[in-house]
Amino acid sequence: MIILGCFVLLGSALPLTAQLIWQGLEKQHPPKVLDRLGSYDAVVVLSGMLSGFSYKGTFRSEWADPDRFFAGIEVLKSGKTSTLIFTRGLLPWGNSKAEGEILKIKAIEMGVNETQIILSDTVYNTAEEARAVKELMEENGIDKI
């Protein structure tokens, strides 16, 4: 029984197992087609898509899972919203800028007007992101996200 338990534990720790579980979950909720989206006051892009490393004493960020960033830009450029909200998720690696600040720079580089971007306060997890977005909605008169 112990040997079987070890195999189950090792098997569930494999990256392949995690990938299969994620695929199963995401298959049930595919991304919406842009043409089928309605209009929104803002689109929210949550943090958690950058990773980072230190190089010669400075922090460098790199994409880990950028699909939500590019989807937010696409929704904005389609005219379905006029505002992007980025959350300032704090990256746990070194002394880096909050993720929302990095994403804002990247969005501006892609042609988004700075006035169309709102940043939340610094947040450390998804629950804090939700509260920060709610506050921004109230402060900016945003009803539909």
What is each of the regions a protein language model found here?
Residues 1-4:
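Cytosolic-side transmembrane helix boundary signature
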Residues 11-145:
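A structural signal for short, hydrophobic/glycine-enriched beta-strand patches
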